[in-house]
Amino acid sequence: MHNASDIQSALVPMVIEQTAKGERSYDIYSRLLKERIIFLVGQVEEHMANLIVAQLLFLESESPDKDIFLYINSPGGSVTAGMAIYDTMQFIKPNVSTVCIGQAASMGAFLLAGGEKGKRHCLPNSRVMIHQPLGGFQGQASDIAIHAKEILGIKNKLNQMLAEHTGQPLEVVERDTDRDNFMSATQAVEYGLVDSVMTKRG
């Protein structure tokens, strides 16, 4: 019986490269990593965040002065996992250019906006969605109160950071993240989440 990750890894294409020493085969993501391209695809969770952080740190050690390109197609996910990626993006020396392909929702949208100013992009038919962090804790009343306070603190922090990255006033961000707020690529540019819609490579 094969699990989902076995099936997924079997579906990852391999590319063959000619070198002076003969042929070398890579999975497609490793080959793109050589071009300083990282894919952030699917739910943002701890394991995925660790892999993204490791790739960012590796590319920094390879060339601290060359840009890194982070392609995002994500419905969002864990705030703490997302923050691990975000903090690393801000911490490393290379500029991180972000590109939304498909969708960047919730924490995906936050990471999209967290790219280097002037180097954040959407492809024309991608969608972006911002909202407040989701709660869902169950337990004793006192524990629920503790978690509610924590979520409120996270919400305020994320709104402040989003205001900084977009140039929108804090009260506008607070209003706009109160419910699921979907945007087209053009609307995401107008809002300040990204800097341009890319239709063709320049």
Curated annotation (Swiss-Prot):
SUPFAM superfamilies membership: ClpP/crotonase
Broad enzyme group: hydrolase
Presence of the UniProt keyword Transcription in the record: no
Origin: domain of life: Bacteria
Keywords carried by this UniProt record: Cytoplasm, Hydrolase, Protease, Serine protease
PROSITE patterns referenced in this protein's UniProt entry, alphabetically: CLP_PROTEASE_HIS, CLP_PROTEASE_SER
Substrates-to-products reaction catalysed: Hydrolysis of proteins to small peptides in the presence of ATP and magnesium. alpha-casein is the usual test substrate. In the absence of ATP, only oligopeptides shorter than five residues are hydrolyzed (such as succinyl-Leu-Tyr-|-NHMec, and Leu-Tyr-Leu-|-Tyr-Trp, in which cleavage of the -Tyr-|-Leu- and -Tyr-|-Trp bonds also occurs)
Molecular functions per Gene Ontology: ATP-dependent peptidase activity; ATPase binding; serine-type endopeptidase activity
Protein's UniProt keywords contain DNA-binding: no
Compartments where located: Cytoplasm
Record function comment: Cleaves peptides in various proteins in a process that requires ATP hydrolysis. Has a chymotrypsin-like activity. Plays a major role in the degradation of misfolded proteins.
Protein name (record): ATP-dependent Clp protease proteolytic subunit
Organism for this UniProt entry: Shewanella baltica (strain OS155 / ATCC BAA-1091)
